[in-house]
UniProtKB/Swiss-Prot annotation:
It holds the Pfam family DOG1. One of its GO terms (biological process) is DNA-templated transcription. InterPro entries: Seed_Dev/Stress_Resp_Reg, TGA_domain. This is Protein DOG1-like 2. Residues 10-246 form the DOG1 domain. Disruption phenotype: No germination phenotype. One of its GO terms (molecular function) is sequence-specific DNA binding. The gene is DOGL2. It comes from Arabidopsis thaliana.
Length: 255
């Protein structure tokens, strides 16, 4: 792909990311309001959760479409901070981290401060108990544990396939790489096409994991989970920008 074409695609990908981040901020406001005003209205909570999950599905679809035009940018995005890029798995977070966040919200003493921070709604309204996730039943926990194991297995499969793609490129003769042989370009094109497929699979796994989680938990627990996840993501991005400034780097603009 020509440099100008690749740059144009990257601009579209970056715009897609910033639009998603703006929507994330709106989601947080909506989730806060739901916890303050609608916590006893399951229908309203379900509608909000469904909308947010659908918004993520739409975003993942846009990412997939753009990745087939040039997927390499998603594996070290210029719009991310360096610390965020160091934590990426297949262009995003590990789906299994969604479930680990739930475990952190369940109320163990080791995670109490984190839970209280992530669930803080505003300066005048806090959830001071362990959070609604602390009310998870044994049946819910069992289903989440089964999902966790299933997701880890699928993550490992995607990771292994990615490693195989890298090995295929590494096996190219060094002389061919130096002289930019046509076979090398074909191999790199094949590599990027394969990685675009894997990125789509990873995004699908992220979406399916999110959807299955909200099916297991109550509407109120789903709102709590989504709020904590989005606050954690934004906090990591902000912290990454601070660290980038201290190190003299350039952090991405605010997901």
């Amino acid at each position: 792909m020509e440099r100008s074409s690749s740059y144009g695609v990257e601009k579209l990908q970056k715009r897609c990311y910033h639009e998603w981040m703006s929507l994330q901020t709106k989601h947080i406001d909506d989730l806060k309001e739901a916890l303050m005003c609608q916590r006893n209205n399951d229908d309203k909570l379900e509608d909000l959760v469904g909308k947010i999950v659908n918004d993520y599905h739409t975003y993942a679809g846009k990412r997939s479409e753009l990745s087939y035009r040039c997927c390499a940018h998603y594996f070290a995005p210029s719009w991310n901070t360096p610390i965020e890029n160091s934590m990426l798995w297949m262009g995003g977070c590990r789906p299994s981290s969604f479930i680990r966040l739930i475990y952190a919200l369940c109320g163990s003493q080791a995670e109490t401060q984190l839970s209280q921070y992530l669930l803080k709604i505003d300066d005048d309204f806090d959830i001071n108990h362990g959070g609604f996730m602390s009310d998870l039943t044994a049946t819910q926990l069992g289903k989440l544990n089964d999902l966790h194991l299933e997701v880890i297995k699928k993550e490992d499969k995607i990771t292994k396939t990615s490693a195989n793609f890298q090995d295929d490129v590494a096996d190219l003769p060094i002389a061919d790489v130096v002289h930019a042989d046509v076979a090398v370009e074909d191999a790199l094109d094949k590599h990027e096409e394969g990685m675009a497929v894997l990125l789509a699979e990873a995004d699908k796994l992220r979406f399916e994991t999110l959807r299955k989680i909200v099916d297991v938990v109550t509407p109120l627990q789903a709102v709590e989970f989504l709020l904590a996840g989005k606050r954690l993501q934004l906090s990591l991005h902000d912290r990454g920008r601070v660290r980038a400034d201290v190190c003299g780097g350039v952090g991405g603009a605010a997901v």
